[in-house]
Amino acid sequence: MAALDRSMARVEFDPDGNITDANENFLTLLGYRRDEILGKPHRQLCDGAYAQSEDYRRFWERLRRGEHFSGRCKRITREGRPLWLEATYNPVRDGQGRLLKVVKYASDIDAIVHQEHEMQSKLDALSRSMAMIEFDLDGNVLAANDNFLATMGYGRAELASANHRQFCEPGYRDGPQYADLWRRLNRGEYVTGQFRRVHRNGQPVWLEASYNPVYDADGKLYKVVKFASDVSDRMRRYQAEADNAHQAHTLSTETRTVAEHGALIIQSAVEEMLKIANTLDASSLNIGELSQHSQQITSIVNTIREIAEQTNLLALNAAIEAARAGDQGRGFAVVADEVRQLAERTSKSTKEIADMIGRIQTGTRSVIDDMQHSQEQARRGVELANEAGAAILGIRESTHKVVEAVQQFSRTLNADL
């Protein structure tokens, strides 16, 4: 008894519940002096509402019948502060079996109760906001809250003999990842992540969840508690974004291919246009030389025309002189007439040649003008082709950056999925 008095709070009551004795531990715990508490009723140490309740009346009835009580009690200190005690009420009888007194031993568990209450409040808050389910170490369902039942579409009775496996897709639950999950949980590892599960109607459900191993008072692992939130809508958005990213990646890759092909075509076009420009330059030079030659021919024709005119004049003079000579100059006159006719034909042919050369020169000048215009167009075409080629190269470079960005975005989305 002395050892108990040193380690625990003790208070004694008569059969009517009035305090007859209390040790120092009890006085210190409740904040009373001895003279303040002796003779006071037990109800003074209790919450007012409880002291007036039917439960309180039955409590003392059981003690008066000699029934032992052990458990947690909420009592009130001298300052009015609630205090939780782990207590035993022990009825003591005399030799005739009459109730002599009730001895109470108690220890302060106020801090423990408040800690437990805080933990329970947190668990209650989690249970109100999240889906919660408990499993034994073989995956059999022990309990589930209403949020879990609503999320997965089950009734409470349906989970009485259920196992974690039935919430998983066949390909997953029969594979190595599922076996590894439960190996880790049975080793006491905490597992968190996004998990694809199956609704009662067979549709996929995405859960953001944590699997939490739970230990008993002896430190032995005995169950797993899972907290989860339904993130199916978010995952569907992620999947849609991933699909769009994949499509964008495909299109941007095709665009890059087209741009590269276009760059090659334009480069080939530039090379061909450069060849055309060079050919036009050479043709322009040849036509220029031809124009010079036609001008030289014109000069020669003019010289021939002048010679023909002079020959015609000389033939006319010779005919005049032959006429003066009479019969002696008749033969010379015939020759002079032939020379004159030849000079006239030469003059006529020379005129025709001059006209033809004039037309050739006119055509040549027109061709030269057209060639110069074509050269200018060819040069402008080369410049435009080069500009187009530079633009295509820019597009190709930009498309390459787009492809890289889309690839990175796609990888990020796939990692999230």
Swiss-Prot record:
All residue ranges annotated as the PAS domain in the record: 1-66, 115-188
Repeat is among the record's keywords: yes
CDD domains, per the entry: MCP_signal, PAS
Keyword Repeat recorded: yes
Domain Methyl-accepting transducer residue range list: 242-417
Listed GO biological process terms: chemotaxis; signal transduction
Ranges where the PAC domain occurs: 67-114, 191-241
InterPro entries: Bact_Chemotaxis_MeTrfase, Chemotax_Me-accpt_rcpt, MCPsignal_dom, PAC, PAS, PAS-assoc_C, PAS-like_dom_sf, PAS_fold_3
GO-annotated molecular function: protein methyltransferase activity; transmembrane signaling receptor activity
Free-text disruption phenotype from the record: Cells are named mutant biofilms and do not disperse upon induction of the dispersion by succinate, silver nitrate, mercury chloride or sodium arsenate. They are resistant to hydrogen peroxide and more hydrophobic. They show higher intracellular levels of c-di-GMP (5- to 6-fold higher than in wild-type), increased adherent properties and impaired twitching motility. They display smaller, densely packed and symmetrical microcolonies.
Role of this protein: Essential for biofilm dispersion by sensing environmental cues. May be involved in sensing and transducing signals within cells, resulting in the modulation of c-di-GMP levels, swimming motility and adhesiveness of the bacterial cell surface.
Protein's name in the database: Biofilm dispersion protein BdlA
Organism: Pseudomonas aeruginosa (strain ATCC 15692 / DSM 22644 / CIP 104116 / JCM 14847 / LMG 12228 / 1C / PRS 101 / PAO1)
